[in-house]
Amino acid sequence: MLKRLIEVRDETGCPVPLLVKVAPDLTSEECTDIAQVALETGVDGMIVSNTTLARPSGLIGRHAHQAGGLSGPPLFAPSTALLAETYRLTRGRLPLIGVGGISSAEDAYAKIRAGANLVQLYTALVFAGPGLVGQIKSGLASLLARDGFSSVAEAVGISQGAALVRQPIKPSQAATPRYTRG
């Protein structure tokens, strides 16, 4: 199906990026399969991860056992673990968007260090408002400087200890993957 979507996109002459979004409830085998398909088909990136159906035992309140997707802080640890695994499996060759439980600069930095090129906010943005974006941006700049990085790109995947060959992104390539495929 992905190959056909890419063909249709390419036939239209409108190079809209195609990203695959995955849930944190994947098994290791499913994660491996999806990463391999993403690399083979040439998707433009992955969004890791979506809401979870799991309910951690520490949830409190009247909605603790509510059916449906769970998002926000309880999703941070499993989604960050899946992000790190996806980064390892794709060997840094696909841009990854880290999602799930990000509510601070420290959370965003953890996602970046696990392999995210970008981060996505939702739940925390709803509760904290648009000022949260500036707080995270400022805090992230401080964390990067503290650790000797001059850009987010330098910190991507650093927790993995992987030495990948990265190519600097040019403005004309903004919608294309930043890593060499091969």
Report the location of each language-model feature.
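C-terminal extensions of enzymes
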Residues: 112-113, 119, 128-147, 154-182
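Short beta-strand/loop segments at the ligand-binding rim of alpha/beta enzyme cores
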Residues: 11-26, 88-98
